A protein has these predicted regions:
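SF2 helicase catalytic motif II
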Residues: 125-176, 183-188
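Conserved pre-motif I regulatory segment
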Residues: 2-45
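Conserved RecA-like helicase motor core of SF1/SF2 enzymes
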Residues: 143, 405-409, 433, 439-467, ...
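Conserved segment of the helicase C-terminal RecA-like domain
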Residues: 471-498
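Conserved helicase ATPase core of P-loop NTP-dependent helicases/translocases
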Residues: 106-115, 374-378, 384-390, 397-438
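Conserved Walker A/P-loop ATP-binding site and its immediately adjacent core
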Residues: 48, 53-58, 68-90, 129, ...
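Helicase motor interdomain insertion/brace
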Residues: 158, 162, 189, 203-212, ...
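Walker A/P-loop NTP-binding motif
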Residues: 31-42, 50-67, 87-90, 163-168
């Protein structure tokens, strides 16, 4: 299984290791990441589509060689677990029956057998957390945990909880945390590092010399959409009603003057009302009802402005179903005359929002130009998935299907893991050429041929924005088109996502420069001793390849020095260098390093491990 073909040379170098099957392409930035990951527990940040998985294979191979303990790779969904197992069985040079899935789909009593038999376990985090907590498994039997999509390791997420358990119960375990986007704030990045016991940061940037030969062109286009007068007329009574309710809450003193109503402002008003109720202020109870109605109306208006009429009606239909279970607040909201009149008028008008037809035209044009194209459409909402799937199915040559999560939502059932995997295979093979997906499709989709990604709306998260764009331009040029409805939440979200992404990369650079994570191990430790690189029948060591490629590519793609860069360099010269911390002191809970497998005086291995 060869990765992207090398663009500069006809000869493709490949990695040679006793526990790897031939075919892993050697890339300098991946070898650099490998060296960091084998030196100490590492957070690897690499753009989507540049082969984080290949680094994971190489790290697993070396741990198979060095130790007899188990290796766990954690992925957020059962679908990704199955995908990781399939790829690892193709690439790892061990008995495929020793690479097993460990998920909640297997009963607990059978998981015990899987744990005992498996050498490499592909797992979901919840099952590892639960079984480790219940002492069904011991994390002390593990030498390495790879956290794929590691940005989840914050707060009470199962990723973070597994990290806590691993650090508390395994003194010598290594961690490799892999992600394209660890978080937009320093706090989020550092929390991931802390929860997973990270000693070291490895960051690969798309525009750096080592990645340039493998970068394919990605076109990012934003399509601004004006709301038609017919839609504005339909929603005007709803907006007027909301404005009156907001004024009432402001007169009661629970909300200040606002230019644009946001979810945060509504939440702050709700908190103010809660404090009033705790003081036994009788006004609080009436205000609480009004604020709840304002929140529901705010959500409805956002849907109508950014998604369309059908999405708004689906929202109200779902609320009506919830109201039948006895939710008095929902029933009160739906019984308002303004809502009743809106539902009657909207059902008679059909879809008024232009986004759906814009998507229809773009899909039709792309498929008519190239029937072999693959198009991936992302949206936040399942009802939009349903509407788009029905709309696109009427276009000649379009073979469209939906891709949603496993949980059920209202009347709509989720997809099973088997259905998800089958759908991806159909998309990959061309049986389906248009896939309409919710956020479940953002992480780790193994779809190398999506030439066009349509984002029905922008997303505020830098993480999710990066992942959506990463679904295209993996092996050939691709296009990302984002639909933004003017004068709506879309515009704010679009600007916020760009700002957060810039901030994320700046924070990574600051953290690395300040030495808050990075540690440089002793040069005597030859972590790549078992890796060779074969080029046109000849072999060199991985270290030699890394040095030669780095020199070659830095000459081929020199860094352009700008005035801003010069000024930054001057400013940095006056900064006090960060205090260096020893590996022994910095490692959490006496965590071992690969340096302990080598003689301190000679730098040679102390003992040789044999394969199982």
């Amino acid at each position: 299984m060869l990765l992207n073909p090398r663009l500069e040379d006809n000869m493709m170098p490949v990695v040679i290791h006793p526990f790897l099957k031939n075919g892993v392409e050697a890339r300098a930035y991946q070898i650099r990441a490998l060296k960091n990951a084998l030196s100490s527990s590492c957070l690897m940040v690499m753009p989507t589509g540049f082969g984080k998985t290949a680094v994971e294979w190489m790290v697993m191979a070396e741990f198979l060689r060095l130790q007899q303990k188990k290796i766990i790779l954690i992925a957020p969904t059962t679908g990704l677990v199955a995908q990781q197992q399939r790829m690892a069985r193709e690439m790892m040079n061990i008995d495929p029956d020793m690479i097993l899935r460990y998920t909640g789909e297997t009963p607990p009593e059978k998981r015990t057998e899987i744990w005992q038999k498996g050498r490499i376990l592909m797992a979901t985090p919840q099952v590892i957390r639960n079984d480790a907590t219940n002492r069904r498994i011991s994390l002390d039997e593990v030498s390495l945990i790879i956290f794929d999509e590691a940005h989840h390791a914050t707060g009470n997420h199962a990723y973070a909880q597994v990290g806590d358990l691993y650090l508390n119960h395994n003194n010598g375990g290594f961690t490799l945390a892999a992600t394209a986007s660890p978080g937009s704030s320093k706090g989020a990045i550092l929390e991931v590092a802390k929860r997973l016991g990270i000693d070291r940061l490895d960051v690969s940037l798309k525009d750096e010399a080592l990645l340039r030969p493998y970068t394919v062109k990605l076109h990012n286009d934003i399509i601004y959409v004006d709301l038609p007068e017919s839609l504005k007329t339909l929603i005007f009574p709803l907006q007027e009603h909301q404005s009156r309710e907001v004024e009432n809450i402001q007169r009661m003193g629970f909300m200040g003057s606002v230019k644009n109503l946001t979810s945060r402002i509504i939440t702050e008003a709700q908190q103010s009302v809660s404090r009033a109720i705790s003081r036994r202020d009788k006004r609080g109870y009436n205000a609480a009802r009004k604020v709840s109605d304002i929140r529901r109306m705010h959500m409805l208006l956002d849907l109508l402005k950014t998604q369309g009429v059908y999405a708004g009606l689906a929202f109200l239909d779902k609320a009506e179903s919830e109201g039948r279970t006895g939710d008095r607040g929902t029933n009160r909201f739906l019984s308002q005359p303004v809502i009743h009149n809106f539902r009657i008028n909207a059902k008679n008008l059909g879809e008024l929002h232009p986004k759906a037809n814009i998507v229809r035209e773009m899909v039709r044009d792309r498929i008519s130009e190239n029937p072999n194209s693959r198009i991936l459409i992302f949206t936040e909402y399942r009802y939009t998935v349903k509407n788009l799937t029905e709309l696109l199915s009427t276009i000649e040559g379009v073979k469209v299907s939906q891709f949603i999560g496993q949980s059920s939502s209202g009347k709509q059932k989720g997809m099973t893991q088997k259905e998800q995997l089958a759908r991806l295979e159909e998309f990959r093979s061309g049986e389906i050429n248009v896939l309409v997906a919710t956020s479940v499709g953002e992480e780790g989709l193994d779809v190398p041929a999506a030439e066009l990604v349509l984002m029905y709306e922008p997303v505020p998260s830098a993480i999710r924005s990066i992942q959506r764009r990463g679904r295209t331009a993996r092996q050939s040029s691709g296009t990302v088109k984002t639909l933004v409805a003017n004068d709506t939440r879309d515009q704010y979200v679009s600007h916020a996502a760009k700002a957060r992404e810039r901030k994320m990369y700046n924070n990574l650079a600051d953290i690395e420069r300040q030495g808050r994570i990075e540690f440089r191990p002793s040069s005597k430790v030859d972590t790549l001793v078992a890796f060779d690189i074969e080029i046109d029948g000849e072999r060199i060591t991985a270290d030699e390849f890394l040095e030669l490629e780095t020199t070659r590519l830095n000459k081929l793609y020199p860094v352009e020095q700008t005035n801003d860069n010069v000024q930054k360099d001057k400013n940095n010269n006056h900064k006090k260098p960060p205090k260096k911390v020893s590996l022994k002191d910095k490692r959490p809970r006496n965590q071992m390093g690969l340096d302990q497998f080598f003689d301190k005086e000679t730098g040679t291995k102390r003992s040789k491990r044999t394969r199982n």
